[in-house]
Design a protein with these regions (language model features):
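Nucleotide/pyrophosphate-binding catalytic subdomain
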Residues: 1-91
Length: 91
């Protein structure tokens, strides 16, 4: 039976485009890594906010009936920056 690995990456290992590229190399270096679970990007620097924490904040604000558009835009911006820095154009 062919060995198959499930691997999970997230947090600082997916914090920015540079880290995404490192993760891609890790995955491609081992053909048994066939299933990849990606969680939310973490901090890029000490004062940064983890995406998970931003998502919790959106939930908290929504639960209290507050407008969370600005908070959600920060999450979208984080992912869009990663996409742009990876040079992905057709998204």
């Amino acid at each position: 039976m062919k060995e198959t690995k499930v691997v999970k990456f997230g947090g600082s290992s997916l914090a920015d485009a540079k880290q995404f590229k490192k993760v891609a190399e890790i995955i491609l270096d081992d053909p048994t890594r066939r299933f990849v679970v990606a969680s939310a990007p973490g901090k890029r620097y000490v004062e940064d906010i983890k995406v998970t924490d931003m998502l919790y904040k959106c939930y908290e604000m929504a639960s209290e009936g507050q407008n969370f558009d600005e908070q959600f835009q920060m999450i979208k911006d984080r992912y869009n920056n990663i996409i742009m820095d990876l040079g992905i154009e057709d998204f």
